[in-house]
Structure formats: structure tokens, C-alpha cells
Amino acid sequence: MKKELEAKYSYEIVEENRYEWWIQNEYFKANPDSKKPKFSIVLPPPNVTGKLHIGHAWDGSLQDAIIRFKKLNGFDVLYLPGMDHAGISTQVKVEAKLREQGISRFELGREKFLEQAWKWKHEYAAIIRQQWSKLGLAFDYSMEKFTLDDDINKIVTEIFVDFYNKGLIYKGKRIVNWDPMQKTAISNVEVIYKEVEGFMYHFKYMIQGTNEFLNVATTRPETMFADQCLVVNPKDERYTSFIGKKAINPVNNQAIPIIADDYVELDFGTGVMKCTPAHDLNDFEIAVRHNLEKPICMNEDGTINEMGGEEYQGLDRFEARNKIIENLTKEKTFIKAEPMIHQVGFSERSNAIVEPYLSDQWFVKMDSFADMILKLQESNDKIKFFPERFDQVLKKWMENIHDWTISRQLWWGHRIPAWYNKEDKTKIYVGMEAPKDAENWIQDEDVLDTWFSSGLWPFATLMRGEGFESKYFKEYLPNGVLVTGHDIIFSWVSRMIFQTIEYTGQIPFKDVLIHGLVRDEHGAKMSKSLGNGIDPMDVIVNNGSDSLRFSLLTNSTPGQDIRYSDSKVKAAWNFINKLWNASRYVLMNLEEDFKPWEEQAILNSNSLNETDKWVLTEFSKVSKQVNYLIDKYEFAIAGKMLYDFVWNTYCSWYIEFAKVNLNNPKTKEATQQTIVYLLKNILIMLHPYLPFVTEHIYKTLDMKNSILEESWFDKEFVFETDYINVVIELINSIREFRATNNIKNNVLLNWNATNGNLEIITKYNLEINNFLNEFVNANLSINESLVSETTSLSVLDFFIEIPNDDFIDKEKMLEELATKKKELENEISRSERMLSNENFISKAAPSKIEEEKEKYELYKQQLELIQDKLNKM
């Protein structure tokens, strides 16, 4: 077997070509014909707008860790890659690139522009695939999909037609969020609200035929051209005498009625509001109730249309605002401008101020779908959210639902399968293909909201042009888990749920793992403007993929943001280096002809020494907890447990014990077998976190062809070896004592155990002394009467003491005991706070709660012993 690792860990050597080797050997290829249980993850498709960022790296690392964990646990896994055409985002990028060449999309025309968009897609898709490979994501590339693939387009069209025929999709005039820069409607979630300094402008609306006026305030004077009425509350005694009269709009001198509606709040502003139905959602609803006209005073680009007359027509909306103020000031109908801070909506893509705008759009009726989701989440078949609180976020969205605007005035996307009759535009044909007399019809120019096609992602990707007959659809739906951010629960998660159920009758996924944002080390959100963004590829070039993955995963708690820092990546590298050096030591202590025992031989062996039994027992405990935690997606806690076991239990202690046992012919073979058996299983359990280095080290063990052919550790070793944990604490305490007091190792120290729980010390006194003799040149007696003054050390739940000789400094000892007492009091206070915290008790893993309770009791015992010692001194 004799193989060796390189003297130094080099991530460049370890990671080079490994991913290609996995792909070539089809380790990630799904097999729908396999009898193994199935588990699938469909990658949330990154946009082809650019390269992957650190958030993608975190998201992908989480999914990949789950996939590898499931594969090692005997599942046939499918990790399906794909990319999103990202309608408006990509179109913005392509248009910007064309503008640099002095070309507009309208000059190019639709077909030529789409050619440019596809070129962009192919360029960035290649970059993204390269980034995936660097991250080591376990994709089945034979299943890769793009949201504009022909087979996806066919399913999108089918569902649009199906929903339309069921009355779930309709076309109508509604107020939408309008991006005047991109000249398209955008969804609510694509609107970013920012606090902006602005003004509340007050105007006189004169009462027709009188010298009286009403003070009307607005933040958007440019919409006054389309005012249809003034509105007051019918209960507002200040204005009841004006109801039914007419007021003169100061911007165009048109007379408009004064009406009453309960919508107006008595104590807000002046109590009089102008109603502009085509430019405000609430005004639109008032207009519907009162049967008002809904004229539009702006063009699609945000300029004023013919309603502004010669003076204002063609002006940008904000230029028009300033001119209105200027003119009405002269006419003495402008009262004042009150400074204010208010929330203004900006387009996420173009950063233009969004205009509420009445427009002909296609909509999905959402009431029945919202009810569907609410009923599902109250049933036994509900989709599980991790953390559970995000289930309530989904429900809240569904309880406050509005119809979904699905049409976009773009060219890049799924074109709406609707045709209008040339002779009679009110005649609409919706179908899979154009009507037979296509020459008499014109297809809708608009495309579908990107989220419409993305909402089909969990199942459309599995159909492979075969529809419901696809083996992949039958075997891998529902997906095992969706991993995504909390910011798209409404825009994506909810839509996948209702679209999948409506079309397939199945839920899209069983679990939803929610994560937050990647922030910088100070907690600030990463952004280009702050200059604190991180390119994951730069991190990989400097530290390796495993270091990046480990730092992300071991700081990943469901539902929480993560703070990225270079120091965390460096700490991950140090851990890998520790694992590397430990593995080198193991390999260097094996003979050329070493053959590992079968697992059953380890289980049944009578030749294991006490430290072999101890480390196997400790590993069993850790593996059991790690399994539980990863099943709950608690990668941070599970990773910390593995880190502690590898660094402390295996490397710091077991290998130290093994150095003695490997030099003893009686214990050598069993120790060799144990140390290799453990190394193999450590590598397997670390593989989801560190795929590259674990595969590299595993291959030096000369076992199976790949670590991916191995099985997750599921054995249980239970030996009575708890006393070795006592030995470790004793060795640590005595070593620290020697160092503090400058006592050389060749000086024999005779200790006496006293004051506390001495049951284990008594039962295993001989074994404990063997270890103490070997490792710290010390003896330990029990409850001996010592005549002279002694120095005491607190160890777990008992004390050890030694007679005071010349090397003892009593004042220093008192100081150390006082310091220890303070530390314990702080720990007891912390523990009490945790155990009385309802959130901790309700959300933490039972093992974590039990661990905290045990710590609490131990701290109290230690404090009691120290206090007793201080009292005696």
C-alpha cells in the first residue's frame, strides 16, 4: 500500500484536474433506473448577466455539500445545473454594450438584437461553467438547462395556454410599476425603496365660481394633468359643503368634481387628495368605485404627452415638475413646498425612479393560488422551511396577495403566445402556435416575466422533451431541497410551489433551506459602490477552493447572514494543513505490505488497546451528532464538531497516544488499523466540506477508486473509556502546571486526588497512572493525608493537589484560583441566560441543549470546589 503525500500541502496540486476526473468518470451522473433512494437538487439558475459572486459560491457550496452527503449515504443523486436568461437584467447589459458602439436595439431590430443577446449568453455561460468547476460542484452536466431552451419554451407556452384557458391568466388595464428608462413593467420585488429627500407641494384648487380654494398636496405635480377629481372623507365636516361642487385644476384650468370616499384619512395632510387614476394604485381603485375616466399624461419614456399641452408636452417628468412650480408660482396658485423624507421606488435594474402607470398587461389571477399555498402549509404534506419561521413569511405574502403582472415590454425572453386580429384588435387568440390564417394576426410583442419560466424550474428541467413520461421527472420530483435566499421567497419560491402543483399535481421540493446575505467582516452588505465585494475566483486562486468552501460552510447557519473575512479562509487553510500533516504521519507509519482490515474485523477485534477503543467511541458520538445536524442543514455546528474532533481528539491526542503504541509490538497492528480506519472515515465525513483534499488523501490509502464510492460512517462503538477523557484533562493540567512553575520534565511529580467526584479516578487508578507516567512523569494517589501546605488544581469535577516545595508561589496560586473563580461565575451566568432563553430552547438541537445543561452542572461543581479551596486557604 505504501504511498506518501507531498511534504507540503499545495492546493494547486491537489485541486488541479480533479474536477475533470470526477466528470470523466461520471461520479455525478444520475441514474433513474437505479434501485437506490433518490435525492435531487435543481440549482437555482444564476443569471447570465455576468460572473458568479461570493453569494453564488456560498449557495453552491451548501447544495454541493448536501448532494455529496446524500451520495455517501447511499442515495442516487441528481444535482442539475442551469442558467437563467434574466430578461430585463441581460437586456440592460446587452443594450449598454451596444450603446458603447453607438447602436440602439431599435436600429438593430428584434432578430438582430436577439442574436447579440445569445452571443452574450454563450460568452457568460462558458465563464460560469468554468467557475462551477473551480468550486467543485457535483453537477450532472448531461442534464444542464437554460430557461430559453426549446423544450423549456414549449412547457412555458403550454402552461400559459393552460392557465389562460382556465381563466387564470387575463389581459387588462392595471396600475403597474413602470421603468421609464427600460420602457417596461417590472414586478414589486424588482422595486427598491430608498429614503429620499423631497417635497410635499401644496396647490390651490379654486372652487368653481367662487374665491374659495382647497389646499391640495402632492409629491408628484407632474401627474396633475391627469387629475380626474378631488376626494374628501364623507365624515370630514371641514369639507362636506364642497362635495358635489367642482374645483379648477390649476395646471390646465379644467373643472373636476369633488367627491367623497372613505379611503381619505381625516388626519392625513390637508384631508383633501387629488385623484389621478392612471398614475396611482389607490387612485385607480377609487376611480373604479366611482366610474371615473383614467387618462394617462405620460409617455412610456416618462415624458409628458399631449395632455400637457404645448408648454409641457415632450418635457421629462421632472423638468415638467419644475416648470409647473415656476408657472403656478407666478399665477399665485402654488402655496408652498414642504421638505420631507419619503420612500421612493427605484428600478433594481436601471436605477430609474419607478412610475406607477396604467398599462395594458397580462396578469395571473393569484387568489386561488394563494389559497392553495396556505392550505398546503397547514397540512401534513407541507413543505418544510429551515428555519421554520420563514414558513410564516411565505404565508404573510399569500395573505396579502395581488394579481401578478407577467408581461414585460422586452425582446429577450419567452414571447407571449397571444395573437391579435389585424382587423379587430379586441379579438385575441392564445395557443401553442399561430392561428392557421397567420397572415391575419399579429403576435404580442411582449415577453413573459423571467419569474414565470423560473417558476417551472423544479419540473420543467426534468421533462427532457418527454413531458410526464420522462424517467427523470418520475424519479426526481419532488426535489429533495431548495437552497435559496430569503429575499426571493415571494418572487420565486411561492411561484414554483403553485405553478408546479397546478401543472403536475406534486409539490416542487420537500424542504426549503433559507440563507441570508454574504456581508463583509464588519457586517456591511457587499456592493460595488463600497468596494467591499469579493470575487470567489480570486479567493480560490490565493487559497484554494476547499479553504473557501470550508470557511463558508462552517459559518453557515440556516436563515442567517454570513460574514466573509480573509482570516476565516486562512483558518480553513490551517485546518486543511493540519489534516494533511496528520495524514502524512499516518502514511509514514505503514509498511509497504500494509492491508487494512475489513470493517467487521475492527468491530470484533479483541486486540484494540484502550486509546483505540476510546477514539472509536468518541468518533461514534461525533458522527451521530454530525448526521443529525447535517440532516437539519446545520453545517456550522456540524463543521465545528468535525473540526474539534480532527484537530483535538485525533491529531492532538490520539496521534500522540499512537506514537507510543506504534513502537510497541503488542499494540502496533491494532493501532495502525485504527488510525487508518479513522482517517478514512474522517475523510468521508469531511468530504462534503472539503471535496478536493479529501479525495486526494483518500487515494493515497489505496482503497476504492474514489472516495465517492465509499459509504458514510454509521457504526457505533461503545467502549468504557471515559476515563481517558479524565487522563487528557490531567495531562493538560499537569503540563500547564510545569510550564507555569518552570519545572523540568525529568522532575517526578506526585499528586493526590481529593475533594470531588473520584469515582473514575478510583476505578481506573492503575490505567490513569500508566498514562501519567508515560506522558507527564507524574503519579496520582487518592485521598492521601498531606501534612505540608499544598497547591491545588481544578480538574473537571475534582481537585488534585501537590505538597508545596520551593517551586510553589502561594500568592500566584491564590491569584490563579480567583481568576478561575471569576471565569466560572461568568460561564454560569452565560449558561443560565441561554437555558432561560425561549428561542434557544425551542430552536436548538436537543443534543445542544443537553450539552449546555451538562456544562452548567459542571461549572457549578467546579466553582464549589474552588470556593472550598479558597476558604481553606
Swiss-Prot record:
Subcellular location: Cytoplasm
Gene3D superfamilies given in the database record: HUPs, Isoleucyl-tRNA Synthetase, Domain 1, Valyl-tRNA synthetase, C-terminal domain
Coiled-coil annotated spans: 804-873
CDD domains tied to this protein: Anticodon_Ia_Val (cd07962), ValRS_core (cd00817)
Keyword hit for Transferase: no
Reaction(s) catalysed by this chain's protein: tRNA(Val) + L-valine + ATP = L-valyl-tRNA(Val) + AMP + diphosphate
Motif ('HIGH' region): 46-56
Annotated residues for binding of ATP: K528
Name of the top EC class for this enzyme: ligase
GO cellular component labels: cytosol
Keyword Zinc set for record: no
EC number annotated for this UniProt entry: 6.1.1.9
A single BP term in Gene Ontology: valyl-tRNA aminoacylation
Main location, first listed in the record: cytoplasm
Keywords: Aminoacyl-tRNA synthetase, ATP-binding, Coiled coil, Cytoplasm, Ligase, Nucleotide-binding, Protein biosynthesis
Pfam families for this protein: Anticodon_1 (PF08264), tRNA-synt_1 (PF00133), Val_tRNA-synt_C (PF10458)
Classification via HAMAP family: Val_tRNA_synth_type1
Domain notes per entry: ValRS has two distinct active sites: one for aminoacylation and one for editing. The misactivated threonine is translocated from the active site to the editing site. The C-terminal coiled-coil domain is crucial for aminoacylation activity.
Family: Belongs to the class-I aminoacyl-tRNA synthetase family. ValS type 1 subfamily.
Name of this chain's protein: Valine--tRNA ligase
Source species of the chain: Mesoplasma florum (strain ATCC 33453 / NBRC 100688 / NCTC 11704 / L1)
Gene it is expressed from: valS
